A protein has these predicted regions:
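Single conserved hydrophobic/aromatic residue that forms the stacking wall/gate
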Residues: 416-434
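Acidic, glycine-rich active-site loops and adjacent beta-strand->loop/helix elements
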Residues: 25-27, 48-50, 71-76, 97-103, ...
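Active-site-proximal loop->helix
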Residues: 33-34, 57, 101-121, 239-243
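Phosphate/pyrophosphate-binding active-site segments
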Residues: 2, 133, 153-156, 167-169, ...
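Active-site diphosphate/adenylate-binding microenvironment
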Residues: 4-8, 12-17, 22-25, 30-37, ...
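N-terminal cofactor/phosphate-binding cores enriched in small/glycine residues
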Residues: 2-84, 88
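Structural signature of the thiamine diphosphate
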Residues: 15-18, 60-97, 120-170, 189-199, ...
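Glycine-rich, anion-gripping cofactor-binding loops and their flanking helix/strand elements
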Residues: 60, 205-296, 373-403, 419
Length: 434
């Protein structure tokens, strides 16, 4: 088999089953190999930003990475905004970026560029293959490095793709495991929670599952701490039966007031709260000066295990988490506005729906109003780079075809990737609405 075939076979054997792509000439042997190697679903995007955004949404729902296939440096550049969002959201993606044949690079053809330099700011691991016999091993490393929360970028020169690889595919690889937290931090968290009622647990750093919410909710109920979610969650399980969580406000002044009486801030995956932008006379760090900020687990550590261990250390003090009770939400009447639209969504949201939120100001009432709606997952814009909503919804629908996907999309934001409704209509098994 050739290099491209061995690469795809290695990806498939390692659990990577979907490739979102906008290929060009340099990637044609990879495209041809898709017909020769079973197990990889190929989804075409009309623009690279759609490709990367869909890979982000897929990974958030599937719990594992998809691949992207992009055309040289400019194609990767077109995809950067949503790769940035994925990186900020701790979402795994494996980017395969085609390049000129190795012997052609010296001629500086029009599309020649520094692909590794373009990839570096949005990738945790970057590698350029130089030999067909090594490409499968590089693919296995890319899967391992992406794990459950990182971005890998593998550059695939055309001659490496079409060249013969007598070694064939590499053995299936396992994703990089997240390390356990230092026991010292668990003990520090217990002391912080025992220090008094002015403690807050701030959740984030990737997917916050229903189990993680319940664990954190039990800790909060047992200690009197407040339980809070970062402003823009990657994915959070919420709605009826899920743990009650506050949400850190977006505006700096509101966030400062929200955190003013917190003396102990325990971070579970979340970063120290900072202002989205700098403003004159407004501090960058939003927690109060007297607040002790303690990291229980970083986004690159096993957050669920840390919560379980912390709960065990609390011993007999544990209590049940406060959860949202499902209530019948009356449908609105009268004028159509942000509030009535949000109320209608809350009342009609199907059980186990997936909500992708890029609704901007119009969607602001939706998050609190849906707290007692049917159980659902909420996906937010993690990196602030707009144009994420529709592509993310497509990827989420491909990952979870049995679930209804609702995309809250601002009218201006939708114009950034306006080609995506075509994908919504042309891709099968996608119960989505925007």
């Amino acid at each position: 088999m050739n290099g491209a075939e061995s690469l795809i076979k290695t990806l498939v054997d390692s659990g990577v089953e979907v490739c979102f792509t906008n290929p060009g000439t340099s990637e044609m042997h990879f495209v041809a190999a898709l017909d020769e190697v079973a197990g990889m679903r190929c989804v075409l995007g009309l623009f690279e930003g759609v490709v990367s955004g869909a890979a982000d949404g897929y990974a958030r729902m599937a719990g594992k990475p998809a691949a992207t296939l992009l055309h040289l440096g400019p194609g990767l550049g077109n995809a950067l905004a949503n790769i940035h969002n994925a990186r900020k959201g701790h979402v795994p993606i494996i980017n395969i970026v085609g390049d000129h044949a190795t012997y052609h690079l010296e001629y500086d053809a029009p599309l020649t560029s520094d692909i590794e330099g373009i990839a570096a700011p949005v990738s945790h691991w970057v590698h350029t293959a130089t030999d067909p016999e090594d490409i499968a091993a590089a693919a296995a490393t890319a899967v391992h490095e992406a794990g459950s929360n990182r971005v890998s970028t593998l550059v695939l020169p055309a001659d490496v793709s079409w060249g013969e690889n007598p070694r064939g595919p590499s053995a299936p690889t396992q994703p990089r495991e997240l390390p356990l937290v230092d026991p010292v931090r668990l003990e520090e968290a217990v002391r912080a929670l025992d220090a008094g009622p002015r403690a807050m647990i701030l959740m984030g750093g990737g997917v916050v599952t229903a189990e993680m919410g319940d664990l954190a909710g039990r800790i909060a109920a047992s200690t009197g701490a407040r339980l809070c979610l970062e402003t823009f969650p990657t994915r959070v399980a919420r709605g009826a039966g899920r743990a009650v969580m506050e949400r850190l406000p977006y505006l700096a002044e509101q966030a400062i007031e929200f955190l003013a009486d917190v003396d102990q801030l325990i971070l579970v995956g979340a970063a120290t709260p900072v202002s989205f932008f700098a403003y004159p006379g407004v501090p960058s760090v939003l927690s109060a000066d007297q607040c002790n900020v303690l990291t229980l687990a970083t986004a690159d550590e096993n957050r669920a295990s840390a919560l379980k261990d912390l709960l065990l250390l609390l011993g007999d003090k544990t209590a049940n988490a406060r959860v949202y009770e499902q209530t019948e939400i009356p449908l609105p009447s009268g004028e159509l506005n942000a509030m009535s639209l949000s109320q209608g969504l809350a009342g009609l949201l199907p059980a186990q729906a997936v909500v992708v939120d890029e609704g901007a100001t119009t969607a602001l009432p939706t998050f609190p109003l849906t707290a007692q709606a049917a159980p659902h997952d909420w996906l937010a814009l993690t990196g602030g780079s707009i144009g994420f909503g529709l592509p993310c919804a497509v990827g989420a629908a491909i990952a979870a075809p049995e679930r209804k996907v609702v995309c809250l999309e601002g009218d201006g934001l939708s114009l950034i990737h306006i080609s995506e409704p075509t994908r919504l209509n042309s891709t099968s098994r996608m119960p989505s609405s925007a």
